[in-house]
Amino acid sequence: MRRPGAPMRVVAELEYVKGRRIGASQGQNSEVHLSHDPQIGGVVVVKELDKARIPDPTRYFAEAHAMFAAAHPNVVPIKYACQTPGVIALVMPYYPIGSLADRIADDPLSPCAAIRMGLDTLVGVRAIHSNGLLHLDIKPSNVLFDSANRALVADFGQSEVLGPGGVVTGLRMYDRAIPPECFLHGAAIVATDLYQVGLTLYRAVNGDRWFNSQQPSDLRSAVISGDFPDRNAFAPHVPSRLRTVIRQALDKDHTTRIPTATAFIDALTQIAVSIDWRQSTVGPGHVRWTGTPLGRAGLEVDLAPNGSRYDVTIHTVTSTARRAKQQAALWKSDMTNRKAYDHLNKVFRVLS
């Protein structure tokens, strides 16, 4: 007979109706589906982990444990976890607004939006670190947005408990997000997550078309040498101070990298953005930047193709008119693409 108050094991029955697969390009050992949970009567996201790919049964619920331990408003929560004979199922809220990867597939975030996303992500990462964990898979597809446009860190499939001396070994990381120390030493530290946040910010301010155009023939060597990603290649409207902070987070030497999430947060909060330029693709080869200086008419900067060459023009924009901005030194035509971007760097320095 069980004595009163003694623990009692309960085996409950849970079910979910699996719907369409989402994030099909993400994760080699799992599938994520939009699903319906009849117990709570709503839409959820279910991540199914193949038990056959988890050789140690004691690790079946390791990802669920990490998500629960790192509970924070800037971390995607876990509702519950369960299992079938073949899979471990992690049940999470559905965020219909989508991920950072969705937002930057074509064009980048504005500087202010990128800074807000970075701050939210770092607050979540700080909570993860304070619970003795490394995330090890911070990238645009793992940054989701809630209905308040707050960024949350998702997917703890690669996370690990910090070992003795604050080091994690036995890594299973996404190759284009692997920091130099992981290639060199096969080990990760707190600075590893901060590098990945820096890389995520780099992608956010430049857009993934820009990032994905960088294809080094030897990724390992390019990462170790600091040539990938190209720290000098930024979209021309990105403020110089934001570029500096991102470079500090991407320092190839982890001992001189931004040391903590708190220090990274402090660096981002000190950045002043005078004009929050928004970049958009107007047509093939035609890019437009739109910004509104405080108390003044809006500005539009255009990079437009002219045959095989490029022109840069600047206009002021009001609710009723679009007029050429008369700064002859800033208008320029008949340039190569490279020369046009060099000129755009000058344009944004002058206008901002």
What does each model-found stretch correspond to?
Residues 129-145:
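Catalytic-loop of the protein kinase fold
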Residues 85-99, 103:
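Conserved short submotifs of the Hanks-type protein kinase catalytic core
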Residues 80-82:
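A short, aromatic-enriched beta-strand patch in the conserved N-lobe beta-sheet
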Residues 167-182:
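Conserved activation segment of eukaryotic-like protein kinases, specifically the C-terminal portion
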Residues 252-275:
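Terminal C-lobe "cap" of eukaryotic-type protein kinase domains
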Residues 117-118:
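Activation segment signature within eukaryotic-like protein kinase domains
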Residues 53-69:
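AlphaC helix of the eukaryotic protein kinase fold
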